[in-house]
């Protein structure tokens, strides 16, 4: 491994993850024009951000860097595929891994996997509906659209905030940090859908200031304990989201992991798999009509 990679990995273990992220979050929320305009302009140049898709095309018109980063797109920028029964890609990004949940483990990178139960906060009963099911890991790069949408119409059953570290998420850390996605702070949202159980897990990372959902707003840490909120209780009004509807967003984003139960859906075998994807593209079809995807390597 090159020395610079070793140095970067060492810094990941030594850095005060949450302190750095809180400081970056405050800077990203700054509304002083001389600060936020410089940050936004440099970001657009560095990452070649396509503002023609944004509802507000002028990057300097946003009140803060975070407002720019979580910008809305024009209504026709991400048309939804209309294949009956299809599950859509929930976000812009790149599929880093996709396949079957094998013996309660999810593939991370060569030589590394992580536990399904650990990912969902350590509750075996919560994880059981996804045993033997399917997963897809979608990485959102800095230039991507950072809102997350529903692959299927669903009724929210539970939201789980799992505290943890905030390692950077990239190919190097995926190859080198054991159980990366089950160690980083994350928010798991569990839904009931026409194809059975579905989970969307929004994984934080270094300098990810916050994760929001459309029903709860900003999801903030609660000490060091897993916090679960049930939405299927009689005391709460049901929350139902349509297919393609926004369900959450990253302020300085990271990764979305999609989980489905067994024998319901199969991933579509397309050139885009393990490569760039866009929100609204078909990601999976009912098991009776799709081609199974080969095992992760």
Swiss-Prot record:
GO terms for biological process: phosphatidylethanolamine biosynthetic process. Its EC number is 4.1.1.65. It is a peripheral membrane protein. PANTHER family: PHOSPHATIDYLSERINE DECARBOXYLASE (PTHR10067), PHOSPHATIDYLSERINE DECARBOXYLASE PROENZYME, MITOCHONDRIAL (PTHR10067:SF6). It is found in: Cell membrane. Its cofactor is pyruvate. Binds 1 pyruvoyl group covalently per subunit. One of its GO terms (molecular function) is phosphatidylserine decarboxylase activity. Heterodimer of a large membrane-associated beta subunit and a small pyruvoyl-containing alpha subunit. It is an enzyme of class 4 (lyase). The record marks 253-254 as: Cleavage (non-hydrolytic). Keywords: Cell membrane, Decarboxylase, Lipid biosynthesis, Lipid metabolism, Lyase, Membrane, Phospholipid biosynthesis, Phospholipid metabolism, Pyruvate, Zymogen. Is synthesized initially as an inactive proenzyme. Formation of the active enzyme involves a self-maturation process in which the active site pyruvoyl group is generated from an internal serine residue via an autocatalytic post-translational modification. Two non-identical subunits are generated from the proenzyme in this reaction, and the pyruvate is formed at the N-terminus of the alpha chain, which is derived from the carboxyl end of the proenzyme. Coiled coil: none annotated. The active site is at residues 92, 149, 254. This is Phosphatidylserine decarboxylase proenzyme. Pathway: Phospholipid metabolism; phosphatidylethanolamine biosynthesis; phosphatidylethanolamine from CDP-diacylglycerol: step 2/2.
């Amino acid at each position: 491994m090159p020395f610079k990679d070793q140095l970067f990995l060492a810094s990941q273990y030594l850095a005060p993850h949450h302190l750095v992220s809180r400081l970056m979050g405050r800077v990203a929320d700054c509304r002083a024009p001389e600060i936020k305009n410089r940050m936004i302009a440099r970001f657009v140049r560095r990452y070649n951000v396509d503002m023609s898709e944004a509802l507000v095309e002028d990057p300097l018109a946003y009140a803060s860097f975070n407002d720019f980063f979580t910008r809305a797109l024009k209504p026709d920028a991400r048309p939804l595929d209309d294949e009956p029964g299809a599950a859509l890609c929930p976000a812009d990004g790149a599929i880093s891994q996709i396949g079957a949940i094998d013996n309660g483990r999810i593939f991370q990178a060569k030589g590394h996997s992580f536990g399904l139960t650990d990912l969902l906060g350590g509750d075996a009963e919560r994880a059981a509906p996804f045993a033997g099911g399917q997963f897809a890991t979608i990485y959102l790069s800095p230039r991507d659209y950072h809102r997350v949408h529903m692959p299927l119409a669903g009724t929210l059953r539970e939201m789980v905030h799992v505290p943890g570290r905030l390692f950077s998420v990239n190919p190097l850390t995926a190859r080198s940090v054991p159980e990366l996605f089950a160690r980083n702070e994350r928010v798991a949202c569990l839904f009931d859908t026409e194809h059975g159980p579905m989970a969307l897990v929004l994984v934080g990372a270094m300098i990810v200031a916050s994760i929001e959902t459309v029903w709860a707003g900003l999801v903030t840490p609660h000490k060091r304990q897993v916090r679960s909120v049930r939405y299927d209780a009689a005391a709460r009004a049901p929350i139902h989201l349509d297919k393609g509807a926004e369900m959450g967003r990253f302020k300085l984003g990271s990764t979305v992991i999609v989980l489905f139960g067994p024998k319901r859906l199969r991933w579509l075998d397309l050139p885009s798999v393990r490569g760039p994807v866009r929100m609204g593209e078909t990601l999976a079809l009912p098991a009776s009509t799709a081609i199974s995807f080969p095992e992760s390597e």
